[in-house]
Amino acid sequence: MNLPEHFLVTGGAGFIGSYLVERLLADGKAVTVIDDLSTGSLDNLQAVIANPNLRVIESKVSECRALSEIVAESESIYHLAAAVGVELVVNSPIRTIQTNLRETEVVLEAASRYGVPILLTSTSEVYGKSQKPAFSEEDDLLIGPPHLGRWSYACSKLMDEFLAMAFVRERKLPVTIARLFNTVGPRQTGKYGMVLPRFVAAAGAGQPLKVYGDGSQTRCFCYVSDTVEALLRLKRTSAAVGEVVNVGSEEQISVLDLAHRVVSLMNSSSSIELVPYDVALAPGFEDMRNRRPSIEKLWRLTGFRPSHHLDEIIALVAGQPIKKGAPQGAP
């Protein structure tokens, strides 16, 4: 009997990682998850935890004694383990930097030892203070000063990218880097500052939706199944090796309009409050004013574009049907 292909997913008990694990198992693969459960949860894997092709190891990647053995038997690696969420980054910059750098270095070394291809997830945060209407993978990057801890996440993930590309050049390791833009969906928690689950939870409870700053900052939200599909396609595409590729939706909305949209679609009585960044997060906090990807490279390499629109995403996160008569795209 042929054994199923084996994949390692670091951070596989996290929000995105758990959906990726489910998809790999559904495709008949065997999966090992390494996750320290610092921001992930076994609850995210509840639907597949009894699957005989799934093995879960509760550990940091850097402290996993079986890492070499696991990597050696893996067809590919998806490295998603990282510090996540703006509030965690602001409050724990040391943890953020150490987690992102150490875990990535260790998994790249292990992958290089056995020549196992790896897909590394990065972040749109690396675009920093760019004022371009759409971010391209070839753009110069402008990140804020080191005394503002909020940039520690962007800087550490950018160093992950540099390190990964060094492994491509010096050790010929097949690495693909996916820069993710605001992936959302059920299971995502607002605990660490993620905006859409915060808004949906507040609207569902009839509590005020707290918008940081003046709400004019814009974002593009990509549904988690679209993100997972993009990751799988990139991993299967040989032309994506050694490349950085944006993964996200191009449907843009201001955070204030998002709050109004959530209230409207959920038929909520909640009010909307503007909260200064200094109060909500940290003194001197600098936000990215706009965050919209160019996904032409993703389309060129994989033939894939996200298919879920924002109103549908909000309804899926809220766990309810879209309100009748609410036009797509209306605030």
Which role does the model predict for each range below?
Residues 13-16, 42, 87, 130, ...:
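Gly/Ser/Thr-rich beta-alpha loop segments that engage phosphate groups in nucleotides
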Residues 50, 63, 131, 188-192, ...:
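Residue-level signature of the cytosolic catalytic core of signaling kinases
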Residues 1-181, 225, 326, 330-331:
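N-terminal Rossmann-like NAD(P)+-binding domain of SDR-like oxidoreductases, especially those catalyzing
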Residues 7, 182, 203-331:
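C-terminal substrate-binding subdomain of Rossmann-fold SDR/epimerase-dehydratase oxidoreductases
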Residues 44-46, 130-133, 188-191, 224, ...:
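Short aromatic-enriched loop/helix-cap "lid" or pocket-rim segments at secondary-structure transitions
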Residues 159, 163, 167, 199, ...:
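Hydrophobic alpha-helix immediately C-terminal to the catalytic Tyr-X-X-X-Lys motif of short-chain
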Residues 107, 167, 199-202, 230-234:
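A short, amphipathic alpha-helix embedded in the catalytic core of nucleotide-handling enzymes
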